Structures are given as C-alpha cells and as structure tokens.
C-alpha cells in the first residue's frame, strides 16, 4: 500500500500502525515540496524543512519505504531552488521521489495570484529543462514514481500543457 501525508501530520503512533500492519511493502509518501522554509511559509504548508527531514528519518527507522514529493515552479523559487531541493531530498535517503510541476487549480489562493498577475506557472520547456537538470542528480537506486503533476481537467486553470503527460515524456527523450 501507499499512504500519503504531510510531514507535520506524522507521529510515532501512526508510524507504528503502518509498520506493524503486516504487509510486505508499505510506501509512505511525504509532501516535502521544497527545502526552503521561506517558501514553505509562503505556500502555507504547516511544516519546516527540518520537520520534513525528521519525518523521513522516523519513517525510514520504522522500516517503511519513503517517497518524497518535490515541486518545481513554486512561487518565489527558481531552477536553482528546485535543484537544491532535489539534492536535499536525495541526501535524506528515501527510496522514491515524485517530481511535480506546480499547476494552478481553480478556487485557490494561487489561482487568485495567477489571475492578478502575481504568479506565472512554468512554461513546458522550462519544466523540461529543470527535469533534465534534476534527473542526473538522482541515484539509479531511487525509484522515480512521477515526473509530472496530474491535475484533473476540470480543476486546471494553468498551465494547459500540464494535461499533456505524454508530451513531457517525449520532450525528455
């Protein structure tokens, strides 16, 4: 099974429950998003990078497989920030990673910022360039479980290319 949560929602009781449920393979997916505390505050994540590190270590110590989620194109971040996040995530020793482009869903604070011109999502070629810079930094022992966000068509405001998964894979080739 795979269970996803935020680092600040994880405690010893939940880890013990997952570790003790008797399944052969349990993945804990943690929404790390970035290693930058200023960005985590800006996007109202409710946790710090240190809390994320502690959650990863605790989950690994409990014997769980851990997959971290990172986002490219967060408000106020650039490619260097994203790559710093990739390096940071790799250093934590997780077995899996999911990389996501930020997209703008309807009815959110990010949608308001985008509509007012205060946020610009990554262009497709910018995201592909970031992936091309990030993927070689990730050891072959780390399972890449995703390389693009998966928005529902009815919720997506921008960017339109976020619905074209095959296009990103083609661009990477």
Residue ranges of model-derived segments:
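Conserved N-terminal glycine/acidic-rich loop preference
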Residues: 1-8, 37, 50, 59-64, ...
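Core AdoMet radical
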Residues: 1-10, 24-52, 98
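Hydrophobic faces of well-ordered beta-strands that scaffold small-molecule active sites
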Residues: 1-3, 26-30, 66-70, 95-99, ...
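Active-site glycine- and acidic-residue-rich loops that bind
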Residues: 7-11, 45-48, 74-86, 120-128
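Catalytic cores of alpha/beta
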Residues: 12-18, 75-91, 131-132, 154-156
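Acidic (Asp/Glu)-rich catalytic clusters
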Residues: 16-25, 57-61
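Conserved strand-turn element in the central/C-terminal portion of the radical SAM core barrel
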Residues: 37, 59-81, 101-106, 113-121, ...
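Auxiliary Fe-S-binding modules of radical SAM enzymes
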Residues: 90-92, 96, 103-173
